[in-house]
């Protein structure tokens, strides 16, 4: 039975690591995040804005969980997630900016 304990232990360590990452994320301000998403709105079709590139598929980002937005923007910032435009956007944001953007986008309906 000791072989069954290793996967459980490994799973617990991964879970703890993800909680540690979230614990280090600053609290986000949805009000400030709204201002920061100005450049996002044309491409991602945030309600009230016309999509600037109707023939180019981009993901809908409104209503996403804060964790999803934080992880995606952080990965673009680090260069581990690839897309030239989004990497440039991600690199322009601080951790606080990313938390604020996540707070705003997660407050909107999908």
Regions inferred by a protein language model and the residue ranges of each:
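Axial heme c-ligation environment in periplasmic c-type cytochrome domains
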Residues: 51-60, 75-109
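Electrostatic cytochrome c docking/interface patches
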Residues: 19-37, 49
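Bacterial N-terminal signal peptides
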Residues: 9-18
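The canonical Cys-X-X-Cys-His
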Residues: 33, 38-46, 101
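N-terminal secretory signal peptides that target proteins for export/translocation
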Residues: 1-4
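Conserved strand-loop elements at the edges of beta-sheets that form or border functional pockets
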Residues: 63
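Short, solvent-exposed mixed-charge patches
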Residues: 24, 109-110
């Amino acid at each position: 039975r000791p072989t069954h304990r290793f996967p459980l232990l490994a799973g617990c360590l991964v879970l703890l690591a993800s909680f540690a990452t979230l614990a280090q994320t600053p609290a986000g301000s949805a009000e400030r995040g709204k201002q920061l998403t100005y450049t996002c709105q044309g491409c991602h079709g945030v309600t009230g804005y016309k999509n600037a590139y109707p023939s180019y598929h981009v993901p809908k980002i409104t209503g996403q969980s804060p964790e999803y937005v934080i992880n995606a923007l952080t990965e673009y910032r680090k260069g581990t997630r690839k897309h030239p435009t989004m990497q440039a956007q991600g690199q322009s944001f601080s951790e606080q900016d990313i938390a604020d953007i996540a707070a705003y986008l997660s407050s909107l309906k999908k």
